[in-house]
Amino acid sequence: MKKFLFLFLILFAHFSLAQTDKINPKTPPTKDIFFKKENTPNAAPTQKIKQIHSDSINRKPDLYGGNMFFDGNVEFQHNGAVLTANRVVFYQKENFVKAIGNVVLVTSDGNRITAEEMEYDGETQRGIARKNVVLTDPKQTISTDVLYYDRVKNTAYFNSGGTINDGKSTMWTQAATYFIDSKMNEFTGNYTIDNAQYRVEGKNIKQYQSTNTADFFGPTTITNKQKPSNYVYTENGKYLMNQKEVYLNKNSRIHYNGKILTGDKMYYNQLTGFGKGEGNVRLDDPKEKRYIKGGYGEIFEKKDSAMITQKPYAVKELKNDTAYIAAEKFLTYQKPDSIDNTKKKSFLRAYKKVRMYMTKAQGRADSLSFNETDGVLHFFRKPIFWSGEKQITGDKIEAYFNTENENIDSLKVRGNAFAISKVDSLTMKDEFHQVKGKLMTVFYQNNEMKLAKVIGNAQSITYADSEDQKTKKIDRLGVSISNCGEIEALFEDRKIQILACNIGAQGEIYPMSKIAPEKRKFPDYNWNTKDRPLKWEDILVDTPNNEEKQYETDDTLFKKAEEIRLKEEEKRKPKTIKRDRKL
């Protein structure tokens, strides 16, 4: 009997409202352009929104355009979705509802939207939720002020600013679209993604919840929150958030430990600190005022080291010069100071076919090691060092820089040390001062070689001149050849002055008429002009292959003396008496 009475009351209410409709016609809703129906050929017929339950049914001419509204525990259904609210205004003819207060929309695939207000169109299956909107699905939660929801395309969109939380990261953006089927968030404009370790900031991103990956389509920065100076920048790339791996494809940089790696295509692993670059690679170290360019590079953030290959070269800015170095491979690394382990020293190593150019000095070797902090440069395996019209070779050469003015202070040559200096740089005469021995130390003054100390089987060949104090005319005395345990030689503009020749000293000056040209050079004389870099670009090739200078040998006096000597020898020979044979 009670059930019959309830049905009777509902039918009576509908009948009464129907009669009222004839007297006070209902006003259709004012719809947002979002609800405009698209012309879709062969589209399936739409279903009508159904009212399932409410505590009361009402209609007032001065409320909601005279349309029915339902109050108290209201429930409507449409195409598998359930809408509940405190009040729902039902525009029955337009198949449209407006829900007010504690609105909840649950879809058939488990998505849940809560809001203070919501409009839903049964014709387009689209809804607009407003005020304290939260969309929850198994992968994430979206919070915003206004959310546009399309059940047909299964997308949710906002442009009034919102946050997305997946339990691991919180994302903020002004505008985003959530593609529910593919679990993909597309952010347009500025966005921020925050988790416990990193912050991602940029423009335009597609973030996939199923795989926890992100594709970048605009300027993007990924910052280490524990160390904000370490960050990654790109304008196109991919971020694997679970693996903490980043692939960078356009205008990309990796900032780590005060250094910057750039390249055409790059990769970085946040867990291991390993990164690499391919194509137009550049490694900048602003603290050391040095950068390295090459075709390929790797960095090891936790070891604070890096490697650059594929025709690499390094450029280091000094206070009064610039050092250019090329090789087949470069390594850079930091190492704790042996005295104070709270400080680190910076090292640069180069391997295979090393070439170096500075304005005042040039060098070649098989490999190189540079302690940049202490200013010590080591050349290994067949090193050769040029400075002005002077050349030094040996088994190993060490260059020591003044750390204040960054000029060369001295050189140490270990094993088969050999220094050669052109007697007169303004002429093409084949005349060279030479000093050699086991060990050699060369001291610099104003970036020029000034003094050489040679220890162990020290030998020298120098050209001796005399100068008239009045006329300043210089006359050649001859060639001085010395053999000592130790030699100190002073380099001057046009000569080497032997300051000391100690321990078993033997020496003699030979007039030019009494020393053959081949005796004026040591057997291992190796003056090299073909491989010397004359400009910084020369280091970019294995050898500049300069045209070798052709020096003129001045042997006039020696030849004349030889002619006289040979004539004298001829005169001293006994004469042979010819005898006639008797028949």
Labelled PLM ranges:
Residues F4-F12:
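Sec-dependent N-terminal signal peptides
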Residues H14-A18:
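Sec/Tat signal peptide C-region and signal peptidase I cleavage site
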Residues Q19-L583:
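N-terminal amphipathic/hydrophobic interface segments
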Residues M1-F4, Q19:
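Positively charged n-region of N-terminal signal peptides that target proteins for export
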